[in-house]
């Protein structure tokens, strides 16, 4: 196509036949002394003829002349040899030899064609075998995403590829953004902010480290996700980290007024190996309900009240911050797409695995006799009060025992006292 276009446009100018001498009067007078009585006829080659001449197949004489000129130009020694005369013009014998029809050539062509036809079944069989062996190479469609994969077996860490596949980089429209999230935004595409996945991975690892250390220190973690579809996500994360979960609407005052809202929730006192301890019924009945030591919120936009109560109670929080969310609401931000269930499942799975590692480390240390957490102040106060009460009870018991012994002494007289009272001959 390219050569044909070039020839059609430039063939007449580059490859057309040379003009006649009549077109150049000065040169004609210089080269010849003939007087022309009439002007030469105009050139008869049109555009079609010029294109035909340009793309016409060269004759045998033209080819021989071209080869002779090339050899003479490039090899001067060959031009002086007798063999160079053979290239000056083709002989009649050579022309007849080329143009003579040879029946043997037809027989060879037919034999080759017959061999090719006979080889078709074998080639087709080989093609089928090769196709069966290589049909799964490079073209197999593999199931890369299973909706339950982050619930059944959550990963311990999230790579940039995992975050990209989970659409964690997709933000909101540029008109809905919060300027405080400018440090987390990578750029804009089609009117949507793109979150930097490198920043997301860094903040996610930091939050996972916080969850692991809180679990290692025996803290109580609360996973919150109140959007539709987040229920199995928070439940699975809480199971891994041995934490609490909330997938319904947050009741205002659950932290700041927990005496009234959580007064009837049963509690259990355990030792360093998570074995229940008895004898704390009075304390559990009188003590204040528990508050979480760390809150992980998957949708901070709908749980502003929860985050505000956590700030009042000085409880650290971890939240997924989208481009339209205020990052100052939480203590540890994870910039990501909070509208994608796949992204929230990936992030909560990583945090759940971190809590699982922390719990495992705590139990291993407890088996070695190392306690990684401190007894709460209220429980410690109950211990001190119970010890004081026990000491007071023992002191009173000792006093009572001494009084009883004195009474017994006063009731029963000794033998010497009886002799002194009744004389030496007194007998009992």
From Swiss-Prot:
Pfam families, per the entry: Ribosomal_S2
Keywords, alphabetical: Mitochondrion, Ribonucleoprotein, Ribosomal protein
Source organism of the structure: Neurospora crassa (strain ATCC 24698 / 74-OR23-1A / CBS 708.71 / DSM 1257 / FGSC 987)
Family the UniProt entry places it in: Belongs to the universal ribosomal protein uS2 family.
GO biological process: translation
Name recorded for this polypeptide: Small ribosomal subunit protein uS2m
HAMAP family: Ribosomal_uS2_B
Cellular component, GO, one term: mitochondrial small ribosomal subunit
Entry keyword Transport: no
Function of the protein: Component of the mitochondrial ribosome (mitoribosome), a dedicated translation machinery responsible for the synthesis of mitochondrial genome-encoded proteins, including at least some of the essential transmembrane subunits of the mitochondrial respiratory chain. The mitoribosomes are attached to the mitochondrial inner membrane and translation products are cotranslationally integrated into the membrane.
Gene3D superfamilies listed in its UniProt record: Glucose-6-phosphate isomerase like protein, domain 1
Complexes and interactors: Component of the mitochondrial small ribosomal subunit (mt-SSU). Mature N.crassa 74S mitochondrial ribosomes consist of a small (37S) and a large (54S) subunit. The 37S small subunit contains a 16S ribosomal RNA (16S mt-rRNA) and 32 different proteins. The 54S large subunit contains a 23S rRNA (23S mt-rRNA) and 42 different proteins.
Classification of source organism: Eukaryota, Fungi, Dikarya, Ascomycota, Pezizomycotina
Chain residue ranges for the region called Disordered: 30-50
GO molecular function: structural constituent of ribosome
Localization per Swiss-Prot or TrEMBL: Mitochondrion
Primary location recorded for the protein, binned into one broad class: mitochondrion
């Amino acid at each position: 196509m390219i050569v044909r276009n070039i020839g059609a446009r430039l063939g007449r100018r580059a490859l057309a036949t040379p003009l006649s001498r009549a077109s150049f009067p000065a040169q004609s007078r210089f080269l010849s002394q003939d007087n022309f009585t009439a002007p030469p006829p105009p050139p008869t080659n049109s555009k079609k003829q010029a294109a035909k001449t340009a793309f016409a197949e060269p004759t045998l004489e033209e080819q021989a002349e071209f080869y002779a000129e090339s050899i003479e130009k490039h090899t001067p020694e060959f031009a002086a040899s007798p063999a160079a005369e053979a290239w000056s013009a083709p002989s009649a014998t050579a022309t007849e030899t080329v143009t003579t029809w040879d029946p043997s050539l037809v027989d060879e062509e037919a034999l080759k064609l017959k061999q090719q036809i006979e080889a078709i079944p074998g080639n087709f069989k080989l093609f089928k075998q090769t196709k069966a062996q290589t049909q799964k190479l490079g073209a197999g469609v593999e199931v890369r995403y299973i909706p339950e994969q982050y619930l059944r077996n959550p990963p311990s860490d999230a790579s940039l590829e995992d975050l990209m596949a989970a659409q964690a980089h997709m933000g909101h429209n540029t008109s809905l953004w919060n300027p405080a999230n400018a440090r987390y935004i990578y750029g804009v595409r089609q009117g949507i902010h793109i979150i930097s996945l490198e920043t997301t991975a860094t903040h996610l690892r930091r939050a996972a480290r916080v969850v692991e250390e809180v679990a290692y220190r025996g803290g109580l973690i609360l996973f919150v996700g109140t959007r539709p579809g987040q229920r199995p996500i928070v439940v699975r994360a809480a199971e891994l980290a041995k934490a609490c979960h909330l997938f319904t609407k947050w009741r205002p005052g659950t932290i700041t007024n927990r005496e009234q809202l959580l007064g009837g929730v049963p509690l259990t006192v355990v030792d360093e190996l998570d074995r229940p301890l008895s004898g704390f019924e009075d304390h559990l009945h009188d003590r204040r309900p528990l508050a979480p030591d760390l809150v992980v919120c998957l949708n901070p936009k709908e749980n502003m009240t929860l985050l505000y109560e956590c700030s009042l109670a000085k409880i650290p929080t971890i939240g997924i911050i989208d481009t339209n969310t205020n990052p100052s609401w939480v203590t540890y931000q994870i910039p990501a797409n909070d509208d994608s269930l796949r992204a929230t499942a990936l992030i909560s799975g990583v945090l759940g695995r971190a809590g699982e590692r922390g719990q495992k480390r705590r139990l291993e240390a407890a088996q070695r006799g190392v306690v990684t957490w401190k007894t709460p102040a209220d429980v410690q106060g109950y211990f001190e009060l119970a010890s004081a009460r026990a000491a007071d009870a023992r002191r009173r018991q000792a006093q009572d025992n001494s009084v009883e012994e004195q009474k017994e002494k006063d009731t029963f007289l000794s033998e010497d006292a009886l002799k002194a009272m009744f004389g030496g001959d007194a007998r009992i």
